[in-house]
Amino acid sequence: ILATDLSLSYGMRGQYHHSWDEIGHNGSKSLAIWESDDLVNWTEQRLAKIGDEQFGCLWAPDVIYDKKAEDYVVHWSSSHARNNYGEKAIFYSRTKDFKEFSKPEILYEWKEHDIIDSALYEEDGSYYLFVKCGQNPARILLLRSDEITGPYTRIEAFDKSMETIEEGKYEAATAVKLEDGRWCLFLDYYGVPGDRKSTRL
């Protein structure tokens, strides 16, 4: 399991001074990792410092296996000193054992907007990358590449599909391939409270 080490509920008022800019600059300098051989018993959490001091945060990590290189591509969103910790981009690093990681490189960026929440999948030799773009309004993008590390090209047909659903604040795209070969896309809709009340099921 890879996770972001944010501790927001404890640090928002104190460590981060109620500031998302402060979180983006100093929140989660490492990725948290747990390991298991059986999905029941897990190791204690350890922190992997993949980025250097130029990284302001390492958020929303995900991983995909690269069959060609026979290693794993870990990708995440970060702010960085190269643009004064402004718009975030998607970075990646390679590893074979989740202990040693290659130097991070850019996987995808859009210099005018935040790009976060990457989810990467392989289908029929092509690679598909979902990201959240911080445009106004914010939106989910789908991109395609022949290589796992890009370059990636935006799929405009997906934009038109997204226009058919209710406008709102969506993020954290996750896709699952169904038994019939179709893909099912899940989105976190954070525009309204997540609970619903009912007198019956």
PLM regions: where:
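Carbohydrate-active catalytic/glycan-binding domains of CAZyme proteins
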Residues: 1-201
